[in-house]
UniProtKB/Swiss-Prot annotation:
It comes from the Eukaryota. Residues 76-176 form the GS beta-grasp domain. It is an enzyme of class 6 (ligase). Belongs to the glutamine synthetase family. This is Type-1 glutamine synthetase 2. Keywords: ATP-binding, Ligase, Nucleotide-binding. The keyword Ligase applies.
Length: 521
């Protein structure tokens, strides 16, 4: 008998969920790789994954489910899932997924009524230390609940966790509207602004990360030093190193069936460093995929005794980890790449040039969105293929914006971001900066940089990007454009969280200080 296993569902996000039912076409084979597929090439569609029960009796049930509306169809798949729970998750300000398990009945009620989450999710840092400087929540408010609502379009199941259903969620304010400081809602706000001008922001993300043969207990026992990398030596693009860790590589391939399709996966320069390229998609879907990739890579790695780290610069003498973003605007109506103009010597349209001009102009004051931690700025140093100036060039990896001529795939590579970013925030801010340039028809006055860009600021030809989180945060706090495009409440909250972050760092006595001063001063 044919086995029905729904491994990938492609849903057009511009359609209502009711249209979800009509998007199905089925295939069957004996390898449980049946695909329910709506135009894979449509960047307005996205993939999420789930499974239908394999019992033969369910063939008729599936035929009946076609008659259901989309919400009922998803709920039906939840009901026949073998898992008693559904997992829901949402992003905090640092890009960490916070969530919990719900039983099926509780999840079903949350679709209509929403559910409560303690507001401390936006009231503490990545170490769960409570902020003392944010307005949204704290002792002064009593840490009340805030609302949350699962986004049904993000439905997938977790292959390495007994196919537990998973949904991403948006946080909701007391007025029932999107919470202004929710990173995912902030990205939606920027996307809406783009759509108002008939621009569809699309992008693909790349991540580099370190892998160690460690776990959280061994990290503490070793005091975070003398860590054992998954493989020794530098060896970028090494087939030998990937084959030596083929079990881990094959486990990461499970992300394909999880709705996080990888275009490429290889070793990068550095001991135990890997890089993955996530398939191009719409801005929101790209952000969903990116945050799930980071979280789930950690889960998959831990099951094999590996600790995956997306810290931007773990060690001063080794390369940092990037989170590059490949971006362009498509026409919202036709899907045409609006960055391409083949009559231009660099194949750059006027829209593309203004987009780049906007990003270059706003990069210094928007920098905390792209370099959000103390450690981020240890990566942004000369000579390590990370930019230190607001510059652009054609296929130049020393600049902030690398322009890639690729016909219909013509795009920019935003190289400032490290792997420590919150994808929702970095994508929102980068497209907001580009959109500002396009709306205001900014002229791209800076010439493309040829060769080494690192010496330019030393010669006074361009400005140096801020060197610390403290410096960049104070620039951001004064940015009227950031508040206009991302929302004043979001920017004010984000600024205070970054002030808290560098204040915590400044209060510490570091090993370097002890080694330098303890004996000799």
């Amino acid at each position: 008998m044919n086995k029905l296993v729904n491994k990938n569902i492609f849903i057009n996000k511009n359609n209502s969920l009711k249209n979800f039912v009509n998007n199905y076409s089925t295939k069957t084979n004996n390898n449980n790789n049946n695909i329910f597929n709506k135009n894979k090439n449509d960047l307005k569609s996205f993939s999420s994954s789930s499974k239908l029960n394999n019992n033969n009796n369910n063939n008729n049930k599936y035929e009946e489910s076609k008659l259901m509306n989309a919400e009922d169809l998803i709920l039906n798949q939840i009901k026949i899932s073998k898992s008693p729970f559904v997992k829901i998750a949402g992003s905090d300000i640092d890009g960490i997924l916070r969530g919990k398990y719900l039983d099926k009945s509780k999840f079903e009620s949350s679709i209509k009524k929403g559910l409560g989450f303690c507001s401390v999710i936006f009231g503490w840092d990545s170490s769960d230390s409570a902020y003392d400087n944010v307005k949204f929540t704290g002792n002064h408010t009593g840490y009340p609940d805030m609302g949350a609502r699962p986004d049904l379009s993000t439905f997938r199941t977790i292959p390495w966790e007994y196919d537990v259903p998973l949904f991403l969620m948006d946080f909701i304010g007391t007025n029932g509207e999107p919470l202004p400081i929710c990173p995912r809602s902030t990205l939606k706000k920027v996307i809406k602004k783009c759509h108002e001008h008939q621009f569809d922001p699309v992008q693909g993300m790349e991540f580099e990360w370190y892998n160690y043969s460690e776990n959280n207990k061994s990290l503490l026992n070793k005091n975070f030093s003398n860590l054992e990398p998954l493989s020794n030596g530098m060896f970028g693009y090494s087939l030998l190193r990937t084959s030596q860790n083929s079990e881990f590589m094959n486990s990461l391939a499970e992300l394909q069936g999880f709705g996080v399709p990888l275009e490429g996966l290889h070793t990068e320069t550095g001991p135990g460093v890997y890089e993955a390229a996530i398939r191009f998609s719409t801005a929101l879907e790209s952000a969903d995929r990116a945050i799930l990739f980071k979280h789930c890579t950690k889960e998959i790695a831990s099951l094999q005794g590996i600790m995956a780290s997306f810290m931007a610069k773990p060690f001063k003498d080794l390369p940092g980890c990037s989170g590059h973003m490949h971006q362009n605007f498509n026409c919202l109506k036709t899907g045409k790449n609006l960055f391409l103009d083949e009559s231009d010597p660099n194949h750059m349209s006027d829209i593309f040039k203004s987009f780049v001009a906007g990003q270059l102009l706003l990069l210094p004051e928007f920098l905390p969105f792209f370099a959000p931690t103390i450690n981020s700025y240890k990566r942004l140093v000369d000579g390590y293929w990370a930019p230190t100036t607001p510059t652009w060039g054609m296929d130049n990896r020393t600049v902030a914006l690398r322009i890639i001529k690729g016909g219909k795939a013509t795009r920019s590579e935003f190289r400032v971001t490290g792997s420590d970013v919150n994808p929702y925030i970095s994508i929102a801010a980068s497209f907001a900066a580009g959109l500002y340039g396009v709306i205001n028809k900014l002229e791209l006055k800076q010439k493309p940089i040829i060769g080494n860009s690192y010496d330019l600021y030393k010669k006074g030809l361009v400005e140096r990007l801020p060197r610390s989180l403290a410096e960049s945060t104070e620039l951001l706090s004064k940015s009227k454009i950031a508040k206009e495009y991302l929302g004043e409440e979001f920017v004010d909250h984000f600024v205070e969280t970054r002030r808290w972050e560098y204040r915590q760092f400044n209060h510490q006595v570091h090993k370097w200080e002890l080694e330098r001063y303890l004996e000799i001063i």
